[in-house]
Swiss-Prot record:
This protein's record includes keyword Cell membrane: yes
Residues at the active site: D89, H146, S252
Subunit-structure text: Heterodimer of a large membrane-associated beta subunit and a small pyruvoyl-containing alpha subunit.
Post-translational modification: Is synthesized initially as an inactive proenzyme. Formation of the active enzyme involves a self-maturation process in which the active site pyruvoyl group is generated from an internal serine residue via an autocatalytic post-translational modification. Two non-identical subunits are generated from the proenzyme in this reaction, and the pyruvate is formed at the N-terminus of the alpha chain, which is derived from the carboxyl end of the proenzyme.
HAMAP family linked to this entry: PS_decarb_PSD_B_type1 (MF_00662)
Cofactor note: Binds 1 pyruvoyl group covalently per subunit.
Name of the gene encoding the protein in the UniProt record: psd
EC number: 4.1.1.65
InterPro entries recorded: PS_Dcarbxylase, PSD-B, PSD_type1_pro
Name of the protein: Phosphatidylserine decarboxylase proenzyme
GO CC annotations on file: plasma membrane
Keywords of the record: Cell membrane, Decarboxylase, Lipid biosynthesis, Lipid metabolism, Lyase, Membrane, Phospholipid biosynthesis, Phospholipid metabolism, Pyruvate, Zymogen
Classification lineage: Bacteria, Pseudomonadati, Pseudomonadota, Gammaproteobacteria, Alteromonadales
Length: 287
């Protein structure tokens, strides 16, 4: 059955399906939308007591529901300056060192940091010998993405690609998954060096937003787009630790890259398959 599920992903019209679902998710259909949201809450056992708006009727569209805000204070931020924090609610897929420019995906599969970053060689060099962490957001999870550490935006890259599912089954079976799917790469300058936040799209998750650019939707095609941003002066964009930096529609994956000697160790309990909660300690900064 698992092989059939993977095979279907290769032949299904993923981009067309994602566009159709995207239009439905953005539609405001009153009682139909409310009924669908209630079904989704029940199906995925979503704890709406954490949401700023706990009633399904508060959301005009599925997208509003998927990107719902949490109640203030529900995710307390680790204020220890020796630690960076979890950027999202989800589960750790993999983490560890970047070895010879390769990132571990699953047993028998890895991929290059160069490919992940859209073949931006200068960017890839900045993370040689560093560390990575991959976090999967399930459909039930809170879908906003936050800053692990204070950083100033220096570059954004949009990389077109496939829209495979990014669930654990697919990660274990599709080679180079995260370097094949459509993605947005945001690079920040931080006190511990450069940090890349890679927001990976997936089936029916073709819409990725950032707080500075809104929905990132370059023209369709195979061209990589890059934007450079000032890191000093009045137009520089600096986001504080814990601040929102982007959001997904439905679930997806975030891959974080850090420079060599930026991190000392991952926090206790942070390992593959461990549950993450935004704001909790994720890794200790190198002294």
């Amino acid at each position: 059955m698992d092989k059939i599920k993977i095979a279907l992903q290769y032949i299904m019209p993923k981009h067309l399906l994602s566009r159709l679902v995207g239009k439905l998710a953005a539609a405001q259909m009153g009682s139909v939308t409310t009924a669908a949201i209630n079904w989704f809450i029940k199906q995925y056992k979503i704890d709406m007591s954490e949401a700023a708006q706990s009633e399904a009727t508060a959301y005009a569209s599925f997208n509003d529901f998927f990107t719902r805000a949490l109640k203030p204070g529900i995710r307390p931020l680790c204020e220890d300056n020796d630690y960076i924090v979890h950027p999202v609610d989800g589960a750790v897929s993999q983490l560890g060192p970047i070895k010879e420019g390769r990132i571990f995906q699953a047993k028998g599969h890895d991929y290059s940091s160069l490919a992940l970053l859209g073949d931006q060689a200068d960017d890839a060099k900045r993370f040689e010998g560093g560390d990575f962490a991959t976090i999967y957001l399930a459909p039930k999870d809170y879908h906003r993405i936050h800053m692990p550490i204070k950083g100033t935006l220096s570059k954004m890259t949009y990389v077109p690609g496939e829209l495979f599912s990014v669930n654990p089954l697919t990660a274990e079976n599709v080679p180079g998954l995260f370097a094949r799917n459509e993605r947005v790469v945001a690079i920040f300058e931080t006190e511990i060096g450069p940090m890349a936040m890679v927001l990976v799209g997936a089936t029916i998750v073709a819409s990725i937003e950032t707080v500075w650019a809104g929905t990132v939707t370059p023209p369709t095609g195979k061209k990589v787009f890059t934007w450079d941003y000032p890191t000093e002066g009045p137009n520089a964009l600096t986001l504080e630790k814990g601040a929102e930096m982007g959001r997904f529609k439905l679930g997806s994956t975030v891959v974080m890259l850090f420079a060599k000697d930026a991190l000392d160790k991952f926090a206790d309990g942070v390992e593959p398959k461990s549950v993450t909660r935004m704001g909790q300690a994720f890794a200790k900064i190198e002294d």
